[in-house]
Amino acid sequence: MSYHFNKIEEKWQKYWADNQTFKASNDSEKPKYYVLDMFPYPSGAGLHVGHPLGYIASDIYARFKRHKGFNVLHPQGYDSFGLPAEQYAIQTGQHPAVTTENNIARYREQLDKIGFSFDWSREVRTSEPDYYKWTQWIFIQLFESWYDQEAEKSRAITELEEIFTSEGNSRINAASDDDVEKFSADDWNACSEDEKEQILLKYRLTYLAEAEVNWCPQLGTVLANDEIVNGVSERGGYPVVRKKMTQWSMRISAFSERLLQDLNKIDWTESLKESQRNWIGKSVGAHVDFKIENSKFKIGVFTTRPDTIFGVSFMTLAPEHELVEKITTEDRKEEVQAYIEASAKRSERERMADVKTISGAFTGAYAEHPFTKKPVPIWIGDYVLAGYGTGAVMAVPCGDQRDHDFARHFDLLIPNIFENVDVSQEAYAGKEGTVIANSDFLSGLEYKEALNKVILELEKTGQGYGKTNYRLRDAVFSRQRYWGEPFPVYYVNGLPKMIDEKYLPLKLPEVEKYLPTETGEPPLGNATDWAWDSKNNKVVSNKVLKQSRKLSGQHDEPNSNVTPSAVEGSDDNGIYPLELNTMPGWAGSSWYLFRYMGAGNPDRFVSEEAQKYWENVDLYIGGSEHATGHLLYSRFWTKFLYDRGWLTVEEPFKKLINQGMILGTSAFVYRLEGENVFVSKNQINGNNVQPIHADVSLVNSSDELDIEGFKKWRPEFADAKFLTEDGKYIVGREVEKMSKSKYNVVNPDEICQDYGADTLRMYEMFLGPLEQAKPWNTAGITGVHNFLKKLWKLYYDGEEFFVSDEKASADSLKTFHKTIKKVTEDIEEFSFNTSVSTFMICVNELTAQKCNSREILEPLAVLIAPYAPHIAEELWEKLGNSESVTTAKYPEFEEKYLVESMKNYPVSFNGKMRFTMELSLDMSKEEIEKTVMADERTQKQLDGRTPKKVIVVPGKIVNIVG
C-alpha cells in the first residue's frame, strides 16, 4: 500500500483537534515541563519555511517529554498588537482588528498543517481586551510601586508615603529621578496633595519624564532603537530624528544589578548573556562635579578613570544635554544650534558606531578644574550620548582615543600624564603597571593607588564620590500609535491618575482615522468618546472637557515639550481627559508566559495554584535579536511581580535556545542607472547598474528570468527593455535572510502539499544544527521524503500491512537499540539534525535485515513520533493500538543488545593473516587455542609441523609461530 501522506496528515490533525490530545492539566501527579516558543506577530504575509524552524524543534522536545512521562505545557498565541497592522489600516482604512483576525486565521491554518502539539485551549492574543486588561493591571502595579535599593526589591508606594510622613526622604535609599531634593517629614506633611504626587512621580517604577526619543514624523510615533536601521525606520524607511518628549517610562535601571547577577542562574547561551551584560553595562569609577565659570550651574560626569583627572583639557557634552542652551555664549549660539539640529538626525546607534567622523561645536563656556582650578573649555560632540552616564565627559585626550582624535581635529591641548609613554600620535589606555605623572598629589602612583586616592580626595573636598554606573537606561514606554494597549490613565490638573482596577480593561476606542490628529496628537486624539467619568467610572464623550487635550509628546514640531499640566478636566462633573498614547509592542510580550498557565482566568493574571505548579518556562526557543529587548523586559517584569508577591519565581525562562535562520536564495536583476533597461548578469561589463530583487517564482532552476512574467509583476517594469544572453536573461543569485521584502520566501503550504508535513519537519531539522544559519535548498527534500516511504514499507508485505510476532533477530535488536541510544542523546542535546541521519541508517539496516518484528517496529513508531507524528500515529493505529501514540512510553535503551557475544578472530601464521574464525567472547585462552588448532585450515597451514608457540590475545587475534 502506498504512503498517502495527505490523507494521513489530514486525518490525524483532525483527531488531535477533536480529542484535544495536547491539552495540559494544571492538576497532575506527573512532573511538569513547560515548553514555549516566542509567539509570532501575525503579519499579512503568513508563514514562510524559515518561521517553523524553532517551532519544530520545540515540538519535537515537547513530544519527547510527553513520552518520557511529563505533563507538558506547550501553548501558542499571537503578539497581535503592533505597527504593521496600523500601517495597513492607514493605507486601506480597514480596522487593525479585522486584518489581525484575518492574519491569525491564516497563521492558525498554516500551523495546524505542520502538526504542532500546541495546547490551543490556552491561546492568547495580546490585542484582546481580556488579555490587555492584565497588561494594564501590571502597569498600575508598577505605578503603585517604588524600588528600595537597600533591600534590593520593589515595594508598595504606600510604604514610601509612610516613610515620608514619619521621617522624610533623607534616610531612604530609593531609585529615583536625579533631581530629587532632600526633605523632612515636616516638609512632606506641609505639601498639598498635588505637590506630594509630583514628588512621588520621581520614585514610581513607571513615571512621566522628559526623554530623548527616536521620533519618526511620517509614522507619527516614537520608535525603539531596534526599529531603526541606518537612521531610518525599519518599516517604511522613513527619516528618524532625536527629539525631547514627555513620555511614560519604566524604571528598569533600578534592577540593573539583579538583571546582571541573575544571568548566572539561568541556562542561556554565553553569547546571549554577554549581549545583556554589555547592554546593562556595569562600570565602576567616580562621579566628579565641574563648576561652570560665571554660572550657578555645574556639570556632573561619570568616569571609570578618575586617576586621569589631571589630563583633562576640555569637556564634551551630548548635543541634547540640558545645560547646552543655558551655558552657550551669545556668539556661539548659531553654530551650536546648527550642530544640535544635525545631530538630531542621527540615531544613537549610528553615533556609537561611527568612530571615523569627528564633529563638534564650542559653547564658548568654561568649567573649572576641581583641583587645578584652571579653565576647561566646554564643547558639544555627538560621540557623547545624553542617556549614558550624565551625558557629559571629562575629556582626557592622552588616555582616550576618541578624545585624542577630537583634540587633534580641533587643535586642543593633549597634556601627557603617563610616565614614559608617548601620546603624541595616539592615546594610551593601559591600566595595570601604569604610573601617573604630571598630576600633583597623584604623581608617581600606579593606577589602582591613584584611583583610590583621587576618589578619597574628591569625597573629602565635596567635589565627587565613588560610584557604580550602568549603561542600562529607563525604558520609554509611550507610543504615538493606535493599535496598542491604552494606558489606564486620566489626568487631573495635569497629574496622572489610575483608573480603578475594578473597571479594567479600558478598551481601545473607535476612531475614523489612524493617523495623528491635525494638531499633532496621537491617533487616539481622533476618538470622540475618550474622556473618563471618575464618578461613574466609565468612558464618556470628549465634548464635556473644557479644553482640547494637549498631552505631552503629541505634537509634530521638534522639541515639543508640552507637559501634562496643560490638560484640564472639569472639576465640577469629575470628567477628565484620558491618556492618548498607547503602550509599546513589548508590553504584552513581557508577561505572556504566565497567562498561558491559567489562560482565561477573569480574577488574576495567573492563579497562584497554576503559577506554583508551572513555575516558569523550562525551555524557551526564539531569535537572538530579542536579547536586549523582549528578553530583558520580561526578566524585569518577572522580578517586579516576584518582589510584590504575585509570582514565586524571579526569572521567566530557565533555558533559552536561539535557533538560526533559514536563509533564502534571492534573485537579482540589474537595471542601468537612470534607465528602465535591465542587463543580464554576464553582460554588466562595468556598467553602472542597480541590483533589484526579483520574485524567485519568476526564475527557473537555470537562473533564467521569465521576462513577460516580470513585466506583469510590477507596473513600473511593464515597458522595460532587456539586454539578454542568447535570448535569455540570467539573474544574479545571493543567499540572504528569507523575507517577503526580498521576494525569496518559500511557502510551507506548498511543501506540505507536495511532500507532507512530516517531510517538512524532518527536512528542516536535517538542514543543519539548530543554532546555525542555513540556506534553504529543496534539492535534498526528496531524500527525506523517500526515507519516510521506506519507513512505511517496513510495515508492509507488498500491499498488505504485516508485522510479525516472532522474536527479532540479534542484528535488528542491535540496530534498534543503537538508534534509541543515539536519538535520545541527540534530542537531549538538541542535536536534531544528527537524529534524522540516525533514523535513515536505522531504516536502511532494518530493511536489509528484512525486519518485520513487532518487537522492533512498534517501539520504532514511538521513537520517530516526535519528528514525524502523523506517520507514527497511522502506523501505531495499524499495529492495533486504540490510543494516540502520544500516550506511549518512550522506548528504553538496553545495553545488552549492543554487547557483542562473538568475535571474528584473525588467525595468523608467523604474523601473516590466513583466515578468520568466529568464536565466542566467553571462551578462555585455552579454549580458543584448542578450537583454532583443531580447525582443518590450521592443520593445512602447519602441514604436519608442530608450532613453537600459539599467541592468543582474547577479543583480538590468534598468532601461530613456527
From Swiss-Prot:
SUPFAM superfamilies: Anticodon-binding domain of a subclass of class I aminoacyl-tRNA synthetases, Nucleotidylyl transferase, ValRS/IleRS/LeuRS editing domain. InterPro entries: aa-tRNA-synth_I_CS, Leu-tRNA-ligase, Leu_tRNA-synth_edit, M/V/L/I-tRNA-synth_anticd-bd, Methionyl/Leucyl_tRNA_Synth, Rossmann-like_a/b/a_fold, tRNAsynth_Ia_anticodon-bd, Val/Leu/Ile-tRNA-synth_edit. Pfam families: Anticodon_1, tRNA-synt_1_2, tRNA-synt_1g. The lineage of its organism: Bacteria, Pseudomonadati, Bacteroidota, Flavobacteriia, Flavobacteriales. This is Leucine--tRNA ligase. A motif ('HIGH' region) lies at residues 40-51. ATP binds at residue 740. Keywords: Aminoacyl-tRNA synthetase, ATP-binding, Cytoplasm, Ligase, Nucleotide-binding, Protein biosynthesis. GO terms for cellular component: cytosol. It comes from the Bacteria. A motif ('KMSKS' region) lies at residues 737-741. It is found in: Cytoplasm. One of its GO terms (molecular function) is ATP binding. Belongs to the class-I aminoacyl-tRNA synthetase family. GO terms for biological process: leucyl-tRNA aminoacylation. It is an enzyme of class 6 (ligase).
